[in-house]
From Swiss-Prot:
Belongs to the HisA/HisF family. GO terms for biological process: L-histidine biosynthetic process; L-tryptophan biosynthetic process. It comes from Caldicellulosiruptor bescii (strain ATCC BAA-1888 / DSM 6725 / KCTC 15123 / Z-1320). It catalyses: 1-(5-phospho-beta-D-ribosyl)-5-[(5-phospho-beta-D-ribosylamino)methylideneamino]imidazole-4-carboxamide = 5-[(5-phospho-1-deoxy-D-ribulos-1-ylimino)methylamino]-1-(5-phospho-beta-D-ribosyl)imidazole-4-carboxamide. This is 1-(5-phosphoribosyl)-5-[(5-phosphoribosylamino)methylideneamino] imidazole-4-carboxamide isomerase.
């Protein structure tokens, strides 16, 4: 079980949203590179970076920040947000990013997904499944769909993804615990490397996910508010 600290970027700064709402932005560190170094110092081996500006507009906005995180740390970097064409994938991979997270394009442009997986290798890609009230949401969580969780996972499996990260938007940034029923359900449907995200705020949450068979947990706001100490959680596992 791996604990992955999260860095969400808006205007080059490290922020957290509440339930994916862009009008509820909390600034936690104006220097995300410094934040990544702090995570590394605390024992993290991975970092989960999302370009929230990019997710909204459909192209990379905070690329330089992400490239510098990779340059100045030895962290394994997984990043997403607005990655919707081959040139952007190429840009991130050439900067040393280890994993590319694809979300909206899985449903909007599966041909593109097939192409980049063929060119760069499917092991470089993580599928992102974001949902609210049982239905998938796209475009930085701004766009509702009628796609169910099960239909979303079937699509992800058909495309050949070996890694999946899911987020229940209702729990994200709320510090009120994770949707464990969804965790069990998704674990049954997907047998690849599974990462949980959304509302993970206690050591108990992490141990419960581990017992369900989840492979990794992305933790955000709980680390920034001090509710969870990264060193303690890493030592726990």
């Amino acid at each position: 079980m791996i604990v992955i600290p999260a860095i969400d970027l808006i205007d080059g700064k490290c922020v957290r949203l509440t339930q994916g709402d862009y009008s509820q932005v909390q600034l936690f560190n104006s220097d995300p590179i410094e934040q990544a170094k702090l995570f590394e110092k605390s024992g993290a081996k991975y970092v989960h970076v999302v370009d929230l500006d990019g997710a909204k507009v459909g192209r990379p906005v905070n690329f330089e920040v992400i490239r510098n995180i990779k340059r100045v740390t030895s962290l394994t970097v997984e990043c997403g947000g607005g990655i919707r064409d081959k040139a952007t994938v190429e840009l991130y991979i050439s900067s040393g990013v280890n994993y590319i997270i694809l979300g909206s394009v899985i449903f909007k442009n599966p041909d593109f997904v097939n192409e980049v997986m063929k060119v760069f290798g499917k092991e470089r890609f993580i599928a992102s499944l974001d949902f609210k009230d049982g239905f998938v949401k796209l475009s930085g969580w701004q766009e509702a769909t009628t796609i169910t969780i099960e239909e979303g996972i079937m699509k992800i499996k058909t495309l050949g993804f070996e890694r999946l990260i899911y987020t229940d938007i209702t729990t994200d940034g709320m510090l009120k615990g994770h949707n464990f029923e969804a965790a069990k359900y998704i674990r049954e449907l997907f047998d690849g490397f599974l990462t949980a995200s959304g509302g993970i705020s206690t050591k108990e949450d992490i141990m419960r996910l581990k017992s369900i068979g989840v492979d990794a947990a992305v933790v955000g706001k709980a680390l920034y508010t001090g509710q969870l100490k990264l060193e303690e959680v890493i030592n726990l596992l």
